[in-house]
Amino acid sequence: MPEVKVLAVRELTAYLQRLLANDGRLANVWVKGEISNLRSPTSGHLYFSLKDQAATLRCVMFQGRSRGLSLGLRDGLEVIARGQVAIYPRDGVYQLYVAEIFPAGTGLASLALQELTARLEREGLFAADRKRPLPLLPRRVGLVTSPTGAALRDMITISRRRFPGIELILAPARVQGEVAPRQLALALELLAKRGGVDVIIIGRGGGSAEDLSAFNTELVARAIYACPVPVIAAVGHETDLTLADRVADRRAPTPSAAAEMAVPVRAELEQRLKSLAERARRGMEHRLELARARLERLTKSSGLDRPRQELYYRQQYVDGLEQRLLASWERRSREREQGLNLLAARLEAASPLAILARGYAVCRRPGDGAPLKSSREVLPGEKVEVILKEGLLRCQVEEVGG
């Protein structure tokens, strides 16, 4: 009889858990059903079941997910829930761990958009602290829109009316259809790589929810988020916010309004600069007048006599110090000169040349030039050299005396 492997309950449960965890379809599944047995304990977690005519599915929605839930759940409500299927080991049952829940009448496209919006929000793409201010005076404005739409004409007209001569750079792109998300993202990337653009407007001139779908894609949202310069989204829809609106640094209701945000009125800016310059001039004149008045008061004050007298004392002290330093330097120079003269005299007295000058001579060997100090250092017949004050004698020894 073959050996039978017997599993513990926990081993079988763990095996089933691994099976469910490795099934990608069960990691993010949408389920439609009617709520029953809804419980909401003090922990904030929600426990309920989803059922239809043939089956029941246990569900749990933890407090972190249910806290911001706007939908009022109740027994009998038909909903669509998204979550992960896993086994609850204690009871040995599978259940749905719910991440999001929507009314059953919601379309799948709307559910997918809500899921994407929630995910991007968790990643921080909509955070207010990352929004960048628009430049006060942009040199170049980038435009990402259709080259044939009314939105482009409106933005060009308004920009040039507000600031004649401003440079507008168009990166054309389709704004609806299947290729629109890719073209919009690529246009943003090209403007960013080109450099020199201070602000970018991306948008279109309104339309239905389906027409605006390109601006609700993850590709466009991430392209705006990654753009190194401020972006204004102008999708042209007053009520519904697109993902592009949420990610952009500023949102404008229309392309025309976006142009007004991005481009200042030249005359107003010049007037503002003149006002600032005038304020700065008046402020400087006021400060100079205060300084002039203070100086005049100090000049007339008798209190200046004491500092002036102190200054004279200081100058007198410096003059005396200078004289003492010069005198000390001259004295030390004379002492050093006298010492050098004395040393030179001693050296002169000890010099062999001085001895020769007094009539003496130096006798040395002709080969090595060593001076001879005794007659015992030579023999008769050897040659020697005799050095006089003036000249040299080469001699031969005839006789050596003691």
From Swiss-Prot:
Its EC number is 3.1.11.6. Heterooligomer composed of large and small subunits. Bidirectionally degrades single-stranded DNA into large acid-insoluble oligonucleotides, which are then degraded further into small acid-soluble oligonucleotides. InterPro entries: Exonuc_VII_L (IPR003753), Exonuc_VII_lsu_C (IPR020579), OB-fold_nuc-bd_dom (IPR025824). It catalyses: Exonucleolytic cleavage in either 5'- to 3'- or 3'- to 5'-direction to yield nucleoside 5'-phosphates. It comes from Moorella thermoacetica (strain ATCC 39073 / JCM 9320). One of its GO terms (biological process) is DNA catabolic process. Belongs to the XseA family. It is found in: Cytoplasm. One of its GO terms (molecular function) is nucleic acid binding. Pfam families: Exonuc_VII_L, tRNA_anti_2. It is an enzyme of class 3 (hydrolase). This is Exodeoxyribonuclease 7 large subunit. Keywords: Cytoplasm, Exonuclease, Hydrolase, Nuclease. The gene is xseA. GO terms for cellular component: cytoplasm; exodeoxyribonuclease VII complex. The keyword Metal-binding does not apply.
